[in-house]
């Protein structure tokens, strides 16, 4: 088995993991960033909505997002639109943004290992985490580290394996399609509330360009047993609410994700193990938005 030594090993190549890896590398630590997928952001699990003020703080380029000036809200019987003179919100190109963050970590000195899935957490005689073993293609690699950062998202892979945390009991489940549309206001997003849309959450239309958008449904668990994927397909097929104004819809890609909704209920430091991002529950419990928190806490 190949054995590698690092000051810091980060598990998870999302926004929290890439940000943590970059900061550690900038502070002259040797850093390994481990990502189980073939490439960063191979699978999209978020709608990518955030605020432009935060984007600018994180120095994310303008070509990584679509700006939003109008905010439309509707229930089955009412709707309202609030407009700004300048764009304040944004819908991220999730893949482009995550890869930008990872490339920045790599440029700072972090070594990225893709297609590398953690299979075992290593402990010393005191039960302290000292590394991980991961399967990478046709071999196993032992990563020894002084500090482990669990940025594995909802799964909390390292912390759960060590017995520090249990599965989240309260969480949101989101399903969405990236779609091509006939008609779309590029700078106007929609949030749809009410039983017709989601019995414990909301539905959305988030434009990503002049003719593409993310249309989705989020449902809180265990508050509702409704499957968001089934509800989403019903809304699109029946063209309910503002979805009807999109005209013909061509489904491009399906996204599905889980996000914890228990607030900052977890301890985030266990000796030399640090939890960041969704692993630590660092998300807005009102609308279940977490990218800006993941980057900030990762840093």
Question: What does each model-found stretch correspond to?
Answer:
Residues 2-16:
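Beta1/beta-strand and adjacent pyrophosphate-binding region of the FAD-binding site
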Residues 9, 13, 25-44:
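Glycine-rich FAD pyrophosphate-binding loop
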Residues 16, 39, 155:
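Conserved Rossmann-like nucleotide-cofactor binding loop
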Residues 23, 36-74:
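N-terminal FAD cofactor-binding segment of flavoenzymes
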Residues 56-57, 70, 89, 95-111:
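N-terminal Rossmann-like dinucleotide/flavin-binding domain of flavoprotein oxidoreductases
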Residues 84-103, 157, 220-229:
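Short beta-strand to alpha-helix junction loop
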Residues 107-244, 265, 281:
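Predominantly flavin-linked oxidoreductase catalytic cores and closely associated redox partners
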Residues 117, 223-299:
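FAD/FMN-dependent oxidoreductases across multiple families
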């Amino acid at each position: 088995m190949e054995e590698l030594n690092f000051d810091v090993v980060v598990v998870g190549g999302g926004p929290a993991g890439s940000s943590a890896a970059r900061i550690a590398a900038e502070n002259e630590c040797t850093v390994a960033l481990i990502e189980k997928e073939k490439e960063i952001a191979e699978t999209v699990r978020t709608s990518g909505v955030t605020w432009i003020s935060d984007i600018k703080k994180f120095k994310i380029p303008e070509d990584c997002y679509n700006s939003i000036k109008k905010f439309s809200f509707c229930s089955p019987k009412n709707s309202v639109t609030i407009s700004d003179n300048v764009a304040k919100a944004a819908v991220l190109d999730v893949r482009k943004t995550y890869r930008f963050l990872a490339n920045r970590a790599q440029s700072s000195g972090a070594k990225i290992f893709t297609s590398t899935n953690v299979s075992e957490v290593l402990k010393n005689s005191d039960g302290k985490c000292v590394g991980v073993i991961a399967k990478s293609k046709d071999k196993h690699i032992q990563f020894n580290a002084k500090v482990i950062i669990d940025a594995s998202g909802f799964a909390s892979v390292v912390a759960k394996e060590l017995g520090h945390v249990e599965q989240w009991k309260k969480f949101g489940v989101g399903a969405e399609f990236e779609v091509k549309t006939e008609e779309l206001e590029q700078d106007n997003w929609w949030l749809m509330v009410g039983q017709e849309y989601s019995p414990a959450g909301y539905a959305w239309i988030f434009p990503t360009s002049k003719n593409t958008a993310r249309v989705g449904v989020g449902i809180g668990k265990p508050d509702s047993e409704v499957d968001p994927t089934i509800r989403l397909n019903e809304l699109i097929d029946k063209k309910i609410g503002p979805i009807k104004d999109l005209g013909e819809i061509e489904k491009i890609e399906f996204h599905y994700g889980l996000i914890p909704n228990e607030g900052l209920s977890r301890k985030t430091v266990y000796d030399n193990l640090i939890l960041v991002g969704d692993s630590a529950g660092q998300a807005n419990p009102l609308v279940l938005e977490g990218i800006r928190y993941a980057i900030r806490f990762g840093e």
